[in-house]
Amino acid sequence: MRFHLGLTEALQEREPNINASSKDLSLLHFELYRRSEPIMDIDEESYLNAGPSAPSKIPQGGEGDGLQGMSKKAMKRAAKQARLEEIKPLKRAAERERRRQRTAQLAEGYAAGTLSEADKELVERRRRVEKERKEAQRRIESGDQANDWLGGVVIDLGFDDLMTDQEIASMAQQLGYLYSSNRTAEKPVRTVIHTTFSPAASPRLWQRMENFNWHKWSRCHWWEQGLETLKSQLDPSTSILSVQSVVSKETQDKAGIDTKSLLSRLTGPQVPVDLQAGKHKLVYLSADAEDELLSLSEDEIYIIGGIVDRNRHKNLCQGKAEQLGIRTARLPIGTFLEMLPTRKALTVNQVFDILVKYLHLGDWAAAFEAVIPIRKYAPGRKAKRAKTETKRNEKVEEEVECTSAEGEEDIGVIEESAEVDPEDVFSNQ
């Protein structure tokens, strides 16, 4: 049986007379949830004993209706998830306040000249980024896009059903980081198309993105239609020169009042004016491709697979591209990936960052180093991380041995939310 170490210690401090049996700790874990802010009006005995073999004392109506017929383990899992959802806004507010205080401390220390070299570098880097952001916004508002790269990038979001909820949350964040990178890039990509994006096509991602003000993102286009539609639109033999944006009836039926206003921001299948049928060719970036991408051309549109899957699905993007008859290519960074001891798969925003850095620097090695500095993966750092991880695992194993008992169910580890809310990334600019 696994326990969140900090939570167990906090419980035993609050109730010093309890023994460390699994039953007592199970009750106290639930008690901490209930006392801090009740999820539902259920006493501990009803909560732990409810099930097919015992009459349920769970209140009828409201949230209790959804718990009827659930096993004890499923009820615990649902209660934990509900509690995490309740405290998420509080955690976000606390994190914002912590960042605000940290920023104020850094500014004060920088002015007084008392910061360490690392903190001083952090402050200066943040100021450079903010300056670049304001300059990029000024260029957009003034219509000055002369430095834009006239090719295109497509984020293929047609994998909603292959990701977990946590991976969907990570995907939404990566899209935010990608937009921020393009907004502040020295040579931004003029056209970024997101395909398969709507309440019907990608319901969970759509819900996540509602808080990101995606409809205000500059240089971004959002399509409900998939990659196959874009391919046909760019084919001069099948493309329609003048086409109105179309939202499917299924999507309209699912839309609420607020959602319908967002649906008007979907522009597919209208190809952006900077992309021309017969001129621009699609290239799907895939680590499994045989061809290596030697340079970037403004006559090509590069597709990045919008999926977070921890390498579960092998050859997914390669297979999809082959099925659609789209050329594939891999970034010429295999040598650099081999130098990474712990990470082989790049995130969507990292792939995009490498592209825009290459557009500015004209060198793949420099672009990769700018996005993922190799110095962070020096042998010394690797050994130190391994040692820290070993100690952490040993501590967890000791806790498990002290608290586990036969016949008890696994309470599970309370996981921190993977969400981050950097205001400079997800602003309305």
Swiss-Prot record:
CDD domains assigned: SPOUT_Trm10-like
Composition bias, Basic and acidic residues: 386-395
InterPro entries: MT_TRM10-typ, MT_TRM10-typ_sf, tRNA_m1G_MeTrfase_euk, tRNA_MeTrfase_TRMD/TRM10
Subunit structure: Monomer.
Gene name of the record: TRM10
Any one of the GO BP annotations: tRNA N1-guanine methylation
Keyword Ribosomal protein attributed: no
Highest taxon of the lineage: Eukaryota
Gene Ontology MF terms in the entry: tRNA (guanosine(9)-N1)-methyltransferase activity; tRNA binding
Gene Ontology CC annotation, any one: cytoplasm
Region (Disordered): 383-429
PANTHER family associated with the record: TRNA (GUANINE-9-) METHYLTRANSFERASE, TRNA METHYLTRANSFERASE 10 HOMOLOG A
Binding positions for S-adenosyl-L-methionine per the UniProt entry: 285-286, 305, 309-313, 317, 331, 344-346
Compartment annotation: Cytoplasm; Nucleus
Function description: S-adenosyl-L-methionine-dependent guanine N(1)-methyltransferase that catalyzes the formation of N(1)-methylguanine at position 9 (m1G9) in cytoplasmic tRNA.
Pfam families membership: tRNA_m1G_MT (PF01746)
Ranges annotated as biased composition (Acidic residues): 396-429
Protein name: tRNA (guanine(9)-N1)-methyltransferase
Reactions mediated catalytically: guanosine(9) in tRNA + S-adenosyl-L-methionine = N(1)-methylguanosine(9) in tRNA + S-adenosyl-L-homocysteine + H(+)
Keywords: Cytoplasm, Methyltransferase, Nucleus, S-adenosyl-L-methionine, Transferase, tRNA processing
Similarity field: Belongs to the class IV-like SAM-binding methyltransferase superfamily. TRM10 family.
Keyword Glycosyltransferase: no
Catalytic residues, chain numbering: 309 (proton acceptor)
Enzyme nomenclature, EC number: 2.1.1.221
